[in-house]
């Protein structure tokens, strides 16, 4: 019985020794792995300046209960993405506004001042009017041949006809105003204004009796 008890103690001690050796080997492997990982992190931080400082600041903020390097105000990729999206949106707006600006500039260059271009040939020029007045003063008549005026003024016939119609209407108005209004109620041959009126009809220039 004593031999069996001693053999059990020996086996227990051997098992404990094996466990301790395996645990020590595992600890050694873990320390080597962590050391290799820290060396890689240090090399990466040296290759990218400023990363280590950012990492330490982030760890300190997380420990102190801060927001860390995540969120809209973080200086990491999220913040840069917002800036990039803002610049892209601004570029799209500028591209949309540029064709409109070019169109307005072309319109302004084609029609300066936003004024409508006058129709050509709508009115006589000042020198043409002076020329007509001088011709009428020399001839002292409205019966000047229109073909001669067309040839002298180098103008179309319709424009000269319209101008003569306006001048004749103005001359008739001035003649009527200068003629005295007759003081009678029926047309007579003595009235210069109503000689063409039939006998017994009212004169167009007659005034009412009452």
Curated annotation (Swiss-Prot):
Description of what induces expression? Expression in embryonic stem cells (ESCs) is dependent on DNMT3L, which mnaintains a low DNA methylation on promoters, allowing its expression.
SMART domains cross-referenced by the UniProt entry: HOX (SM00389)
What are the Gly residues biased-composition ranges? Answer: 47-79
Q: Which residues bind DNA?
A: 117-175
Protein name according to UniProt: Homeobox protein Rhox5
- The Basic and acidic residues compositionally biased stretches are 17-30
Q: List the disulfide bonds.
A: none
User: InterPro entries attached here?
Assistant: HD
Provide the protein's localization.
Answer: Nucleus
Described by its record, this protein's role is as follows:
Transcription factor required for differentiation of embryonic stem cells (ESCs) into primordial germ cells.
- Region called Disordered, residue ranges: 1-119
Major location (coarse): nucleus
A biological process from GO = negative regulation of transcription by RNA polymerase II
Sorted alphabetically, the keyword list is: Differentiation, DNA-binding, Homeobox, Nucleus
Q: Which GO terms describe its molecular function?
A: DNA binding; DNA-binding transcription activator activity, RNA polymerase II-specific
GO CC annotations, alphabetized: chromatin; cytoplasm; nucleus
Q: Does the keyword Nucleus apply?
A: yes
């Amino acid at each position: 019985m004593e031999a069996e008890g001693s053999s059990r103690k020996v086996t227990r001690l051997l098992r404990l020794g094996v466990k301790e050796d395996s645990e020590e080997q595992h600890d050694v492997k873990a320390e080597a792995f962590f050391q290799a990982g820290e060396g890689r992190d240090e090399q990466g931080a040296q290759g990218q300046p400023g990363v280590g400082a950012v990492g330490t600041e982030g760890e300190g903020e997380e420990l102190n209960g801060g927001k860390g390097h995540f969120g809209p105000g973080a200086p990491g990729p999220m913040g840069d993405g917002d800036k990039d999206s803002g610049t892209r949106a601004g570029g799209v707006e500028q591209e949309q506004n540029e064709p409109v600006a070019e169109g307005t500039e072309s319109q302004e260059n084609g029609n300066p001042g936003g004024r409508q271009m006058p129709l050509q040939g709508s009115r006589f020029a000042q020198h043409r009017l002076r020329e007509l007045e001088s011709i009428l003063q020399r001839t002292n008549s409205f019966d000047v041949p229109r073909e001669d005026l067309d040839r002298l003024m180098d103008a179309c016939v319709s424009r000269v006809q319209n101008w003569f119609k306006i001048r004749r209407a103005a001359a008739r108005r001035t003649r009527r105003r200068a003629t005295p209004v007759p003081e009678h109620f029926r047309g007579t041959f003595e009235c210069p204004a109503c000689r063409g009126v039939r006998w017994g009809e009212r004169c167009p220039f007659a005034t009412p009796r009452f």
